[in-house]
């Protein structure tokens, strides 16, 4: 793969594109985590592709991120780069865009929020967070996870 990806302009940025370029089925790709260097499982590869994360390159070699490192470094990112939080209506007035037109990812698992998840933030008066120059919120799965943790810690 070295010679294929030495030109930075031609590097595939998504797993789907990498799969096409190499003519290898997506789940047969063998990629390592950029942080811990462990090989990603098929499930981790599939999830990486589904949540539309981008590949990174080190020495002309593509890397992804495993689930454990993704959750860990998302938490680090939140603590290091959190700026402020706003409600949905405020976010729309700040950006002068509808929530449906904004690209918002989950601050915990990094999956893109669906229009329904964005609407839930407004209905339940949950805030969106500005972290590392990007708007984030909670996907439904992480919303349940964080709500369950809060409930368990108060019991």
Curated annotation (Swiss-Prot):
Q: In Gene Ontology terms, what is a biological process of this protein?
A: symbiont-mediated perturbation of host apoptosis
User: What HAMAP family does the record tag this protein with?
Assistant: HPV_E6
Q: What is this protein called?
A: Protein E6
Quaternary structure note = Forms homodimers. Interacts with ubiquitin-protein ligase UBE3A/E6-AP; this interaction stimulates UBE3A ubiquitin activity. Interacts with host TP53 and EP300; this interaction inhibits TP53 activity.
The remark listed among the other comments is: Belongs to the low risk human alphapapillomavirus family. The cancer-causing human papillomavirus E6 protein has a unique carboxy terminal PDZ domain containing substrate but low risk E6s do not possess this domain.
Report the superkingdom from the record: Viruses
Zinc fingers, unnamed, are found at 33-69, 106-142
User: What GO CC terms are in its UniProt record?
Assistant: host cell cytoplasm; host cell nucleus
Compartments it resides in: Host cytoplasm; Host nucleus
MF-aspect GO terms: DNA binding; zinc ion binding
Its transmembrane ranges are none
Role description: Plays a major role in the induction and maintenance of cellular transformation. E6 associates with host UBE3A/E6-AP ubiquitin-protein ligase and modulates its activity. Sequesters tumor suppressor TP53 in the host cytoplasm and modulates its activity by interacting with host EP300 that results in the reduction of TP53 acetylation and activation. In turn, apoptosis induced by DNA damage is inhibited. E6 also protects host keratinocytes from apoptosis by mediating the degradation of host BAK1. May also inhibit host immune response.
This protein's UniProt keywords: Activator, DNA-binding, Early protein, Host cytoplasm, Host nucleus, Host-virus interaction, Inhibition of host innate immune response by virus, Metal-binding, Modulation of host cell apoptosis by virus, Transcription, Transcription regulation, Viral immunoevasion, Zinc, Zinc-finger
Give the family from UniProt. Answer: Belongs to the papillomaviridae E6 protein family.
């Amino acid at each position: 793969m070295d010679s294929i990806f030495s030109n930075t302009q031609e590097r595939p940025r998504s797993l789907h594109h990498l799969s096409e370029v190499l003519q290898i089925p997506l789940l047969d790709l063998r990629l390592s985590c950029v942080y811990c260097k462990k090989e990603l499982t098929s499930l981790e590869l599939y999830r990486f592709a589904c949540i539309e994360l981008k590949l990174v390159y080190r020495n002309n070699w593509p890397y992804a991120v495993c689930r454990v490192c993704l959750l860990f470094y998302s938490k680090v990112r939140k603590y290091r780069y959190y700026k402020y939080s706003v409600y949905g209506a405020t976010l729309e007035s700040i950006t002068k865009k509808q929530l449906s037109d904004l690209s918002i990812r989950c601050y915990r698992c990094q999956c893109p929020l669906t229009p329904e998840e964005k609407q839930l933030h407004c209905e339940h008066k949950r805030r969106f967070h500005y972290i590392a120059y990007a708007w984030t919120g909670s996907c439904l799965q992480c919303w349940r996870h964080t709500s369950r943790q809060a409930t368990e810690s108060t019991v």
